[in-house]
Amino acid sequence: MTTPSSFSILLLLLLMPVVTNGEYSMQSEQEILNALLKNYDMRVRPPPANSSTEGAVNVRVNIMIRMLSKIDVVNMEYSIQLTFREQWIDPRLAYENLGFYNPPAFLTVPHVKKSLWIPDTFFPTEKAAHRHLIDMENMFLRIYPDGKILYSSRISLTSSCPMRLQLYPLDYQSCNFDLVSYAHTMNDIMYEWDPSTPVQLKPGVGSDLPNFILKNYTTNADCTSHTNTGSYGCLRMQLLFKRQFSYYLVQLYAPTTMIVIVSWVSFWIDLHSTAGRVALGVTTLLTMTTMQSAINAKLPPVSYVKVVDVWLGACQTFVFGALLEYAFVSYQDSVRQNDRSREKAARKAQRRREKLEMVDAEVYQPPCTCHTFEARETFRDKVRRYFTKPDYLPAKIDFYARFVVPLAFLAFNVIYWVSCLIMSANASTPESLV
């Protein structure tokens, strides 16, 4: 029969391992770290997983894009904030076979970062970068029982992005994000993307940029660096951006089209209204030149012709052509007016001579008491007069210009937009932008 005292002793013996395990697990991380770092040399890279002396360390990379804040066309750069993760195996840090009872699933030890070997990864296209340190440094480092290391850090970079602006503003831009070891060749470090999720996007990333939208990304491009010091393994992420066209439709194409249409009003103004037609032509031409300068100020100087240059050049040609058309019409009118003046003067001189020759041929005629009625021109007559081909050459030139110039501008638009859409569709893949 079990006595109360023996039952209490048995219960105490059953609870002792639980308490002991709790006290032991609180000390286990410190004991494991002390055991791992006792003979650890951070100056030596870890041996490969399948050999103790030779072979490269495989570094698996995963990137989470947290923010795309700016794409600067003038400086050809973009700003990105990301969580950069690297995984590799360091057999010297494996603690699953060290004899510890019930070891933790992993050790989170960011404070020992400076005591461990970490890949010397750098970003060749980076112009400026910084790590986030508020409230503490945004990074962590985990050690798993089999020696796998997970290193994660939040960084912000401004990276270069050489842009091809031939199709601006209907262009696609492919920006590369490269990472490579600075000192270790491919014999020492081999980079590879995480096969499950090489790149992650935070929800909403790429859709809130002012002028661009992130269309796609790829991670299969080869960027191995071959130099006189060796070959260095490299990983490349390509970001494909599409420029938002709606902004340029409202701010560029619509205003310039309206300026061209306004310049056509000159064809409908009387050819003798010199002040009005010249003022209209000069004003539209200066406005077109000002808009062209403002648009080019937002772009870097390049040595090739952009599709926006073709559009602006064509619009300026149509506006300038309207001014030249009036100059030609005015010149033709002045020539014909001079001819008429000479003919009129000749007729007056002829009549004067005929009067002097008439001596006795005068016949008395009583003064006329009749009245002359002038028919008023109706609105229909005015419209018919505008759309009826005149016989006077300067007026005939204006008449043809009212229809030929708009049709020419319409034909230019058809050719321009069809060509741009075809070229833009062909440039919508990263391979076409390499």
From Swiss-Prot:
Localization per Swiss-Prot or TrEMBL: Postsynaptic cell membrane; Cell membrane
Secretion signal, residue range per the UniProt entry: 1-22
Keyword Membrane: yes
GO terms under cellular component: chloride channel complex; plasma membrane; postsynaptic membrane
Main function: Glutamate-gated chloride channel subunit; channel properties depend on the subunit composition. Glutamate binding triggers a rapidly reversible current in heteromeric channels formed by glc-1 and glc-2, while the anti-helmintic drug ivermectin and other avermectins trigger a permanently open channel configuration. Channels containing only glc-2 are activated by glutamate, but not by ivermectin (in vitro). The heteromeric channel formed by glc-1 and glc-2 is also activated by ibotenate, and it is blocked by picrotoxin and flufenamic acid.
MF (Gene Ontology): extracellularly glutamate-gated chloride channel activity; transmembrane signaling receptor activity
Keywords per UniProt: Cell membrane, Chloride, Chloride channel, Disulfide bond, Glycoprotein, Ion channel, Ion transport, Ligand-gated ion channel, Membrane, Postsynaptic cell membrane, Receptor, Signal, Synapse, Transmembrane, Transmembrane helix, Transport
Domain of life assignment: Eukaryota
Assembly behavior: Pentamer. Homooligomer that can form functional heterooligomers with glc-1.
Extracellular face of the membrane: 23-246, 297-303, 423-434
Originating organism: Caenorhabditis elegans
Gene Ontology BP term (one): chloride transmembrane transport
Cysteine pairs bridged by disulfides in the record: 161-175, 223-234
Cytoplasmic compartment segments: 270-274, 325-398
Pfam families: Neur_chan_LBD, Neur_chan_memb
Protein's name according to its UniProt entry: Glutamate-gated chloride channel subunit beta
Family, as annotated: Belongs to the ligand-gated ion channel (TC 1.A.9) family. Glutamate-gated chloride channel (TC 1.A.9.4) subfamily.
Binding, L-glutamate: 66, 85, 152, 181
Gene3D superfamilies attached to this UniProt entry: Neurotransmitter-gated ion-channel ligand-binding domain, Neurotransmitter-gated ion-channel transmembrane domain
Major location category of this protein: membrane
Glycosylation sites: 50, 216, 426
